Amino acid sequence: MAQNKANTVSQLQSLKNKSGKSYNQLAEETGLTNVYVAQLLRRQAHLKPETAPKLKAALPELPEELIHEMMKPPLRSYDPNIIQDPTVYRLNEAVMHFGESIKEIINEEFGDGIMSAIDFYCSVDKVQGVDGKDRVVLTFDGKYLPHSEQKTEHMVSRTRPLEKQ
């Protein structure tokens, strides 16, 4: 399965490179975020049927068999060696360094819970800082999910009789 994914990703990346379009251009043409387009082309996200025609219009050489492959639920995984890439390493370092403070602020603002990475939007933007130098803006926009108190009366398996085998 991993080899099939690697082959698909290689084909998708080749098509993107051949198109000469950036992730931002593809995002604009499809109505998706730039990161989601990158996730699609890395088989880390699921191509929805209503989005497939937009992606096909943005990448006209995208063959139907790859579109059908992209519409299957992906194997969301990563190569553990990717952490050695300096950009990925620094992202991980930033999350680890700021994570505890971010968690504390989420809890202070929302209560005991987490930010979803399922109902989640992510984008990368380029802005100029006050010093005129380029800056990277990462936006993580996740739904807040409160932790629930585990009451037995809310536990579906306990609210109806268990079937005997």
Curated annotation (Swiss-Prot):
PANTHER family listed in its UniProt record: CYANATE HYDRATASE
Protein name as catalogued: Cyanate hydratase
UniProt entry keywords in alphabetical sequence: Lyase
HAMAP family: Cyanate_hydrat
InterPro entries: Cro/C1-type_HTH (IPR001387), Cyanase (IPR008076), Cyanate_lyase_C (IPR003712), Cyanate_lyase_C_sf (IPR036581), Lambda_DNA-bd_dom_sf (IPR010982)
Lyase found in the keyword field: yes
Role according to the record: Catalyzes the reaction of cyanate with bicarbonate to produce ammonia and carbon dioxide.
Protein family: Belongs to the cyanase family.
UniProt record, GO biological process: cyanate catabolic process; response to salt stress
SUPFAM superfamilies attached to this UniProt entry: Cyanase C-terminal domain, lambda repressor-like DNA-binding domains
Catalytic center residues: R90, E93, S116
EC number: 4.2.1.104
Species lineage: Eukaryota, Viridiplantae, Streptophyta, Embryophyta, Tracheophyta
Residues in coiled coil: none
Species for this entry: Medicago truncatula (Barrel medic)
GO molecular function, one term: identical protein binding
Catalytic activity, as annotated: cyanate + hydrogencarbonate + 3 H(+) = NH4(+) + 2 CO2
Keyword Lyase: yes
Main enzyme class: lyase
Region (Disordered): 1-20
